[in-house]
Amino acid sequence: LADVLRWRWQAARQGLPRPPVEPIPTQPADLPFLHANRGPAQQPAVTWIGHATVLAQLGGLNLLTDPIFSTRASPVSFAGPRRAQPPGVALTELPPIDAVLVSHNHYDHLDLPSCRALAAQPGGGPLFVVPLGLADWFRRRGIARVVELDWWQHTPLDGVEITLVPAQHWSARGLNDRLKTLWGGFAVFAPDCQLFFAGDTGYSRDFA
């Protein structure tokens, strides 16, 4: 608490740097590669799309973490934190997604419009892998292909094992649901590659 108060005092006294007016330069994604990189000949690849949204291609699958493609991370479209940078890959430019890994329910990691668009992708929606307590939230919003995990539980998907691992964080989407659902990171084990996605976390003994 003392550190937080000191940081707030320093911010009030010294001010905070303003975000850049112009977008930060980006490296355009190789969209033909992303779409062709699938199946037995797939090369392990990770593409950072923005914030916590990452396209991970491994084990012949396309996995997407914490998808947020909306302009704001908020329960409403006209107010709330606004993204400073467009997504590096547009939602409509993504290759077919096999699974979506959601680390927790904060608005900057769980964006309903993005999830609904992914669930409606041509050829069938992906599997949504979520922490304990979140599956019902998805089902009540029309997204039925969902599995929820406790810490250290895993689910197999076409030869790839997806495990929810602990993180030092919390959950809430409103005033009355704080800590009502779990949060975490993901460890993904494929024959050709292993991936760790932390979600949101502070440093804790979970990393020991």
Residue ranges and their predicted role:
Residues 1-93, 188-199:
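Metallo-beta-lactamase
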Residues 50, 131-137, 150-152:
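Short, polar loop motifs at secondary-structure junctions
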Residues 61-63, 99, 127, 160, ...:
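Structural motif
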Residues 67-69, 105, 167-169, 199-201:
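Active-site metal-binding loops of divalent metal-dependent hydrolases
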Residues 77-129, 145-147:
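Active-site metal-binding motif and surrounding structural segment of the metallo-beta-lactamase
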Residues 113, 171-208:
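Active-site-proximal loop/helix segments of hydrolase catalytic cores
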Residues 127, 139-158:
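Binuclear metal-ion centers of metallo-dependent hydrolases, dominated by the metallo-beta-lactamase
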